[in-house]
C-alpha cells in the first residue's frame, strides 16, 4: 500500500479549511484516511497550520510521501 500525506478539503462553499491526512494513494482526495495529523486554515488573517510533527516524522520514516502542497505548508 502506497501511503501519501495530503490535504483533504473541509468547510463550506468559498470558506475552505484543510485537514492534513495520511491516506492510501489510490483513494479519492476526500476519501477514507488512515490518520489525521493536522489541519490548515488559509482563510484567517494569519494562516494557521497545526501539525503533529512526531506523527509526521513517523509516517515519513515508514515510507509515506508528502504531496507538493503539504511540503510547502509544513516547510519540509
From Swiss-Prot:
Gene: rpsP
Xref: PROSITE patterns: RIBOSOMAL_S16 (PS00732)
Cellular component, GO, one term: small ribosomal subunit
Keyword match Signal: no
Coiled coil start-end: none
Family: Belongs to the bacterial ribosomal protein bS16 family.
Disulphides: none
UniProt superkingdom: Bacteria
Protein name (Swiss-Prot/TrEMBL): Small ribosomal subunit protein bS16
Amino acid at each position: 500500500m502506497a501511503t501519501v500525506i495530503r490535504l483533504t478539503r473541509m468547510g463550506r462553499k468559498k470558506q475552505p479549511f484543510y485537514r492534513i491526512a495520511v491516506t492510501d494513494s489510490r483513494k479519492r482526495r476526500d476519501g477514507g484516511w488512515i490518520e489525521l495529523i493536522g489541519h490548515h486554515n488559509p482563510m484567517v488573517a494569519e494562516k494557521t497550520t497545526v501539525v503533529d510533527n512526531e506523527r509526521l516524522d513517523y509516517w515519513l520514516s515508514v515510507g509515506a510521501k508528502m504531496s507538493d502542497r503539504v511540503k510547502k505548508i509544513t516547510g519540509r
